[in-house]
Amino acid sequence: MQVTFFRCGGVALGTAMHHFVIDGRSAFHFIQTWASIARGDASAIVPPSLDRTPLRARSPPTVLFDHSREYRLTAAAASPAPAVASGAKSPEYASAILHVTGAQAAALRARAAGGAPRVSTFRALVSHVWRCACSARALPDDAQSRLYTMVDMRARLAPPLPDAYFGNAVVRTSASARVGDLLAAANGLGFGARRLRAATAQGDGYARSVVDHLETAEMARGGGLPGTDLRVISWMGMPSHDADFGWGELALLAPALMYYAGFVYLMSCPGKAGDVAVAVALEPDCMARFKELFFEEMAAAM
């Protein structure tokens, strides 16, 4: 961690945490607890649940789903795929943080639903980002695009984990679509939203299968994405702006870096109910067009 004090009186606090140890919800729990201690408010501290046994692998491990896309095997385990060169740098990217108002998010939800049951802000907004990225990248209609995301399994396990479970309780999942189908005017936002709903509707059986897969598979180090794909991380609904170290409310909370092109974060905005900040990294020659499409399509939905 690093703390930087500015002459203007502002303070920047940076942290680095390993995803093998904790997920986003646990990371914000840690920061909230740290802030409570710093300002001397012990009453606000919620003790963490440190029991990891609910997420033990089964004996014997029973893998019921194909997790090979979401959890890549090492070159040795996935032969004959070529190994990634050690120390290889990720491709260059441009990044931006785009602001979506509560009214704009509501309009996207309505357009994605199209008269069907309610669509969540996450699914509507991610479908919008997915379509804009495919268009900005000028992908051909017959290309396959895959969108990776994560699901918090705390409430979906049987029995559910405690709310204060401290560890990594998210699993990776993904949705794929033919670009032509994703962008077809007749399909609209609802097509991608339905694909996302199917991908994120996983329950206890899927989570147990992931744990057993990780118990037996030799995993590869992280890397970039193909130019057709996206990886979306959502911090919406998390207590990301509740950390008061005694300096007052946060002015900004954001990822310090975006890793590689195709990475997207969704974040709630402090003090603005329903507003969402979208942090996105794309190939430099695609970013300007992505921004145009992002706001043009959103205006058309209003």
For each predicted feature, which ranges?
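Soluble acyl-CoA-dependent acyltransferase catalytic core bearing the H(X)4D motif
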Residues: 1-229, 235-237
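Low-complexity, glycine/alanine/valine/leucine- and proline-rich hydrophobic stretches
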Residues: 225-302
